[in-house]
Amino acid sequence: MSRKIAILSKYYPLEGGVAARTYWLARGLAKKGHEVHIIADRPDVGGEYRSQGEGKPSEKLSNFFVHRPAYEIPWHIPESDEQSLALLDLTLDVIRKHNIEILDTGYLAPYGMVGHLAKRITGVKHVLRHGVSDVEDFSKKEILNSLLQGTIRSADAVITEERYADLFKPLNSNTHVQHPYIVDTQAFALPYAGGEKKHLAVVGKINYYWDRKGLRQISDHMHNLVDRFDCTCVCQGIGLQEIQKSLGKNTISEYAWPGFMAPWEMPRFLSKVDALFVFEKPAPHSPVSNLAMEALCSGVGIITNYAGFQKDYENVISINENQVLVINPAELFATSSAITNWLGKKWVRKPATQKVSFPDYMAANEKIYEGLGATRLLNMDVYK
């Protein structure tokens, strides 16, 4: 049975794993015949972390819609841009105009909390999801704790991942455990489009811990390999000028430096890439990377400094033999030789397989929606 679903979440042009997950979930639901409405922030939010890629997917789906607040909040006392109120007002409007049955929200704050208020006002069924940083920075630290606990308790369903199940299950009996991200392998199954030279890439935001993510070490290796390989840094953020300054003008000119890409651009980009650098240790919360999963499922090799990389992914993906190369970044020349040998002789491009398929992932979400029963919107005449 097709449903009318609104997804209130982080979305393009904001970058990041949750924004990408929002797109692929919404697209998957639309392709299953559901009417899907994404409710997103104004396109000018996000500062340095706003993507400059293609504004809309080239694929046209007649049942896929995106809504954003149409105006800025005027200056008032106390001074605030009131983005959450703008999102709440828009959410109520979308629910009323499109008879939304299910409101599916991303991060706990602000989207989950806005969804909680929308449920209280309209009676819409609320499915609550979360990221990683919001659990670590809000829930575990008890920030906005009364509102957060009320949001979790009143949700019609909660979708979490295994490591956070014990946090949510005592608060909401209808808590479901899923893998945080499943790749739509059909969308990423593009033919290899690489050139004569092998192509190395790094993708990531450059924020306050860019040095701990190993971006300088990655750049050093790419500098040492640029005569043998094409090198691309898909990087953006508050630390971009700092890292470029530390590398010097000559090194910068050797790489391509595109800004962030939209989620729908990533399959085409990865079809041209032979190996992706993933230096994520130590990251603040060390999550499984959506991008690494997309790369693996596209047949891209992974170069990492983390010996436990494959173990982190073993529950979600079957990585091919020789698809991951673990290096010691301190051994610059030996590592450059190892990368050249690995790409030239050992690694043959072959997509990895997921242990949960994207169709099964979509079916699991539909089952959660079906379990909510019928929606009876409350007092919506008030908003006409």
Would you name each region that the model predicts?
Residues 84-87, 103-122:
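An aromatic- and histidine-rich active-site surface loop
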Residues 244-264:
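Nucleotide-activated donor-binding/catalytic signature segment of Leloir-type glycosyltransferases, i.e.
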Residues 210-213, 278-293, 304-313:
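Nucleotide-sugar-dependent
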Residues 134, 178-188, 205-207, 240:
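Short beta-strand->alpha-helix junction loop in the catalytic core
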Residues 330, 343-378, 383:
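A charged, aromatic-enriched C-terminal amphipathic alpha-helix characteristic of glycosyltransferases
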Residues 11-13, 28, 34-79, 237-242:
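N-terminal strand-loop element at the rim of the active site
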Residues 40, 148-190:
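Donor nucleotide-sugar binding/catalytic pocket of nucleotide-sugar-dependent glycosyltransferases
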Residues 6, 193-213, 219-226:
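Conserved donor-binding/catalytic core segment of Leloir-type glycosyltransferases
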